[in-house]
């Protein structure tokens, strides 16, 4: 704030609570402006444009030097990584090369994830490349995963209480698992941001977010 004041920059720093997923663009709009993005809408619908730091820096470099986005800082971490690091690499770098630069994977490594712990996608192999949106590569050991065979919803409502989009995950799960497309549409499943908060809080260890991704695809196929 002091530097901004000294340079008389037209910038206001707005402190926010450290609460996941506060960094989501729709959540930021509401927290900062008090305006809520309508269902199915975008920040532009309420007069907002949201850019993160990486995008802002990329725009600056493109305008001042003509350099496109060709490099990426990737966090390689998790209990399965020998020596976790933050690495800057060219886009297109094999993930296996990043893991090698971190000393490789430990024995017993069970799961490899491209992305963060909440929204990342599980990978079956390290023979993939770093993309523009790759922010992290995580590896975890088998003894850390807590799974339940044939999980059943206990109707506790915790998933509803933590949903940042004010959806009802317990009903959406039922609709998606049974292929009830019209009900999925009425439940506004396309507004789900796949943050993973519902899956994280679920005491029954139900794979809610995974099922919502499936439900979204069912709805897209129906509307195609």
Language-model region placement:
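Iron-sulfur-cluster electron-transfer modules
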Residues: 1-12, 16-33, 155, 189-190, ...
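Hydrophobic alpha-helical positions that pack around
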Residues: 1-95, 101-106, 116
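Active-site gating/interface segments in enzymes
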Residues: 21, 28-36, 103-154
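Conserved active-site and cofactor/substrate-binding residues in soluble primary-metabolism enzymes
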Residues: 23, 50-58, 68-71, 90-93, ...
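Short alpha-helical segments in extracytoplasmic peptidoglycan/chitin-binding modules
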Residues: 92, 97-99, 112, 163, ...
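Residue-level preference for well-ordered alpha-helical positions
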Residues: 99-100, 203
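A short beta-alpha structural unit
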Residues: 116-120, 157-161, 199
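Ferredoxin-type iron-sulfur electron-transfer modules in oxidoreductases and energy-metabolism complexes
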Residues: 135-150, 160, 164-224
């Amino acid at each position: 704030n002091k530097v901004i004041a000294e340079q008389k920059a037209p910038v206001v720093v707005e402190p926010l609570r450290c609460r996941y997923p506060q960094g989501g663009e729709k959540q930021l709009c509401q927290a900062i402006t008090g305006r809520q993005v309508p269902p199915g809408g975008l920040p532009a619908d309420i007069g907002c444009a949201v850019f993160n730091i990486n995008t802002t820096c990329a725009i600056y470099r493109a305008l001042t030097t003509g350099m496109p986005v060709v490099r990426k800082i990737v966090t390689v971490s998790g209990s399965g990584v020998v020596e976790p690091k933050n690495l800057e690499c060219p886009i297109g770098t094999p993930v296996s090369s990043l893991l090698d630069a971190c000393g490789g994977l430990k024995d017993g490594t069970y799961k490899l994830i491209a992305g963060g712990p909440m929204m990342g996608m599980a990978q079956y192999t390290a023979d993939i490349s770093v993309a523009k949106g790759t922010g992290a590569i995580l590896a975890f050991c088998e003894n850390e995963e807590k799974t339940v065979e044939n999980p059943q919803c206990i109707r506790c409502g915790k998933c509803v209480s933590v949903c940042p989009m004010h959806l009802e995950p317990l009903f959406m799960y039922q609709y998606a698992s049974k292929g009830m497309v019209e009900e999925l549409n009425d439940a506004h499943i396309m507004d789900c941001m796949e943050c993973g908060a519902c899956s994280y809080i679920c005491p029954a260890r139900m794979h809610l977010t995974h099922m919502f991704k499936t439900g979204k695809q069912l709805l897209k196929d129906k509307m195609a």
